[in-house]
């Protein structure tokens, strides 16, 4: 392995060397242009712009050695005259580093620590000390199996199953972990699967053969209780199935595994073992409630995701428990923060049943300090000093509520994942991580220049919490491949944590490996009760139409809607999101305002921000100010409608369909979107959708077939693409239908909550088994994380100011 990497590095250096030797003048001219920018960081588009600026014949000479291709793979250039260092991404998850002395035209290869040390000179100069704390998780995972192909990224469970089936069942001794695993299954004192009559693998195989012979003779629908006592006598307990047919399937699967193991059978068998009865889902920040909260600060897609996830998850748990022949009632607890100042929501209520479920609740636990309970909302960027005490309180609350340990803990976002890590560590429970969004990719250079951001965002605490959580967890769920490893041209959210530096704090030389089999892509869907095609007229919620009509077309301007639409015959271009910088709603308004063709074709309706009350969120305040300026500067009144955030999800579903009735379209213009739940919602309603090509929507939409990609950094082109679409629809009305139908088909194939919940519970089973068989291997990394948490993270969190009451 080491030899292959070394060879690749030399080839890369030799490639640059060859270009230098063959075309010294041309390369000197180009590098001089780069160097002339002075000390700093150049991004890919800046490097390519400089390359485009040189003469065509010089470009042609350099391209004899594929120099432009090399530049396209370069994610950043560090300029410290006379040196220029390049971070070159050969493919997702595979990086190399070189630097060139512009004066001497000498090329040097750099290791990860050398490159990061060079980069730190941008901040610290050359005096960054002889010893810097380096964080390196690679030694702890070196012995773990990992795939090497890009296509394997995000399919961790498939790789793990192949590895386990090959390694765990090759002789009698290797079957011992499975035997121990099956014997370890208990629930509140009740034994499941195997009892103490089965001592070794030989006994197990003999018992399974006897069971097979017996079950074959029974009618398939025979209930388990009719032969329960007979099975107990030979060592088999409840959990194999509810009927003779299902029990026989399980017995045969295990016999097949012991005889000739294969990955598909292993996954199916593990997925049917009774393992998950109590689930805790952590989502502390924002206003977490089921009504009247969407659009509040830090309250958006993540809340919707969890409230859609939980009913589907409960349904799948109930189905599996029944088919396992058990009479256990599952519980799901969504643990969030209790807000005494609940501002008209249920966020001050300790326990709240989740709509559409029987056994799932929101459990709220307050943040506390030595002075008592914290009453007011706190930004997600300022929660860090409260988390440790919060988790101590949460552990007591869930123990009292469940009367048992949870079987699976799911974290959401940075602080939820840190909380999940602390709780899973304390209880010894399988942990699942869902990032939703890793902030480091949203704010360019927020690692190297962390001090500029820290007073407002406290990224030093957040990035550290992210590193701890992603390395502590048993498995990670992402909605898209891009979330893990980006695309050919863009770096993935997790990939950006492979190597980075925060000067003065620590240097990450190996933070995460995107090839790690803990990564799995499991995409969510939209709630089919709320979001369904506009064409399903019998299901349409027409009672909302007068309200929606007033919302869109009323001549009244007030706190809920500003500006009016004069021409009701035009289609509506629609967007709905939080009003913050990254969501880029004001960017969309500016594109529209500056494109006369688009303004002539459609009305623009923006739902975002809450003008009904004064915002406490600084970003929202800035975006509101910008929106007012755009309306006035470009005289948008008459073609534009700005509606305050809408919190009624049922009505919002009909709003999408109402927009579809106008033959309009939905736009998601974010600078970055981890997944894009509103994209899925709009497409599920049959609304043609245009969405950012930075993040998840690039995978959800197949460009030109089920929607369109737009580049938020090139607003003029995005506006032209929108105008082209509506012009074509005007000439060919069937074009609108084609894109609408393409979007619906895409959703039905890939983005449903049923597929999601089945996959999640199977992952919990497989990684629960992996956790059992590799517990000794995981101990070292957990000790390392304990030390890093205690000595580094805790001090950073304590430095975050407590909120003023």
Swiss-Prot record:
One of its GO terms (biological process) is sucrose metabolic process. Its EC number is 2.4.1.13. Keywords: Glycosyltransferase, Transferase. SUPFAM superfamilies: UDP-Glycosyltransferase/glycogen phosphorylase. Pfam families: Glycos_transf_1, GT-B_Sucrose_synth, SUS_EPBD, SUS_N. Residues 275-752 are annotated as: GT-B glycosyltransferase. Signal peptide: none annotated. Gene3D superfamilies: 1.20.120.1230, 3.10.450.330, Glycogen Phosphorylase B. It catalyses: an NDP-alpha-D-glucose + D-fructose = a ribonucleoside 5'-diphosphate + sucrose + H(+). InterPro entries: Glyco_trans_1 (IPR001296), Sucrose_synth_GT-B1 (IPR000368), Sucrose_synthase_pln/cyn (IPR012820), SUS_EPBD (IPR056736), SUS_N (IPR056735). GO terms for molecular function: sucrose synthase activity. Belongs to the glycosyltransferase 1 family. Plant sucrose synthase subfamily. Sucrose-cleaving enzyme that provides UDP-glucose and fructose for various metabolic pathways. This is Sucrose synthase. The lineage of its organism: Eukaryota, Viridiplantae, Streptophyta, Embryophyta, Tracheophyta.
């Amino acid at each position: 392995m080491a030899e292959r990497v070394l060879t690749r590095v030399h080839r890369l250096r030799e490639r640059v060397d060859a270009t230098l030797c063959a075309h010294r003048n041309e390369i000197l001219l180009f590098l001089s242009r780069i160097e002339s920018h002075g000390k700093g960081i150049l991004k890919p588009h800046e490097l390519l712009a400089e390359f485009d600026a040189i003469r065509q014949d010089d470009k042609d000479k350099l391209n004899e050695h594929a120099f432009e291709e090399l530049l396209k793979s370069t994610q950043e250039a560090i300029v410290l005259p006379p040196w220029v260092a390049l971070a070159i991404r050969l493919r997702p998850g595979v990086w190399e580093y070189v630097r060139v002395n512009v004066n001497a035209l000498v090329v040097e290869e750099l290791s990860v620590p050398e490159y990061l040390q060079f980069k730190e000179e941008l901040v610290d100069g050359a005096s960054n000390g002889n010893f810097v704390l380096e964080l390196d998780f690679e030694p702890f995972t070196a012995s773990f199996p990992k795939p090497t192909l890009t296509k394997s990224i995000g399919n961790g469970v498939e790789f793990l199953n192949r590895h386990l089936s090959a390694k765990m069942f090759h002789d009698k001794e290797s079957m011992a972990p499975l035997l121990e695993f099956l014997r370890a299954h208990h629930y509140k004192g009740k034994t499941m699967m195997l009892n103490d009559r089965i001592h070794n693998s030989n006994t197990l195989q003999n018992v399974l053969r006897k069971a097979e012979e017996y079950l074959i003779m029974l009618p398939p629908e025979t209930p388990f209780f009719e032969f329960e006592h007979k099975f107990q006598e030979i060592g088999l307990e409840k959990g194999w199935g509810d009927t003779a047919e299902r029990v026989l399937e399980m017995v045969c699967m295990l016999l097949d595994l012991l005889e000739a193991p294969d990955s598909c059978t292993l996954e199916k068998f593990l997925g049917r073992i009774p393992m998950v009865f109590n689930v805790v889902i952590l989502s502390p920040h924002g206003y977490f409630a089921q009504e009247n909260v969407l659009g509040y600060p830090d309250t958006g897609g993540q809340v919707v995701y969890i409230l859609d996830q939980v009913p589907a998850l409960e349904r799948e748990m109930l189905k599996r428990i029944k088919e396992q022949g058990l009479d256990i009632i599952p519980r799901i607890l969504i643990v969030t923060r209790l807000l005494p100042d609940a501002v008209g929501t249920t966020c001050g209520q300790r326990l709240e049943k989740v709509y559409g479920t029987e056994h799932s609740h929101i459990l709220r636990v307050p943040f506390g300090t030595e002075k008592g309970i914290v009453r007011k909302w706190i930004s997600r960027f300022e929660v860090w000093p409260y988390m440790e005490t919060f988790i101590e309180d949460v552990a007591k609350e869930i123990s009292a509520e469940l009367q048992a340990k949870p079987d699976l803990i799911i974290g959401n976002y940075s602080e939820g994942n840190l909380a999940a890590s602390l709780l899973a560590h304390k209880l010894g429970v399988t942990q699942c991580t869902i990032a939703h969004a890793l902030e480091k990719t949203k704010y360019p250079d927020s690692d190297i220049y962390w001090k500029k951001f820290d007073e407002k965002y406290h990224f030093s605490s957040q990035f550290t919490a992210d590193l701890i959580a992603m390395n502590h967890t048993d498995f990670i769920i992402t909605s898209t491949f891009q979330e893990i490893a980006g695309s050919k041209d863009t770096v993935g959210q997790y990939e950006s944590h492979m190597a980075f530096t925060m000067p003065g704090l620590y240097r990450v030389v190996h933070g995460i490996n995107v090839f790690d089999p803990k990564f799995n892509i499991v995409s969510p869907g939209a709630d089919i009760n709320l979001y369904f095609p506009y064409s399903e007229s019998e299901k349409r919620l027409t009672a909302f139409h007068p309200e929606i009509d007033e919302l869109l077309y009323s001549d009244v301007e007030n706190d809920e809607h500003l500006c009016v639409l004069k021409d009701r015959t035009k289609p509506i271009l629609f967007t709905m999101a939080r009003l913050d910088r990254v969501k880029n709603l004001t960017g969309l308004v500016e594109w529209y305002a500056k494109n006369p063709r688009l303004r002539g074709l459609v009305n623009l309706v923006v739902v975002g921000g809450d003008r009904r009350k004064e915002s406490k969120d600084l970003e929202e305040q800035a975006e509101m100010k910008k929106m007012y300026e755009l309306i006035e500067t470009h005289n948008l009144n008459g073609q534009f409608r700005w509606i305050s955030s809408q919190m009624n999800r049922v009505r919002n579903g009909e709003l999408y369909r109402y927009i579809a009735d106008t033959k309009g379209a939905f736009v998601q213009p974010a600078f970055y979107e981890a997944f894009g739940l509103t994209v899925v919602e709009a497409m599920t309603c049959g609304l043609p959708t245009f969405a950012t090509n930075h993040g998840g929507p690039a995978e959800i939409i197949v460009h030109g077939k089920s929607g369109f990609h737009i580049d938020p950094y090139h607003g003029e082109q995005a506006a032209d693409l929108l105008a082209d679409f509506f012009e074509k629809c005007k000439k060919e009305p069937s074009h609108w239908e084609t894109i609408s139908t393409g979007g619906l088909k895409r959703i039905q194939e890939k983005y449903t909550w049923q597929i999601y919940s089945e996959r999640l519970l199977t992952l919990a089973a497989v990684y629960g088994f992996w956790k059992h068989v590799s517990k000794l291997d995981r101990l070292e990394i957990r000790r390392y994380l304990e030390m890093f948490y205690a000595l580094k993270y805790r001090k950073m969190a304590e430095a975050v100011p407590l909120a003023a009451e």
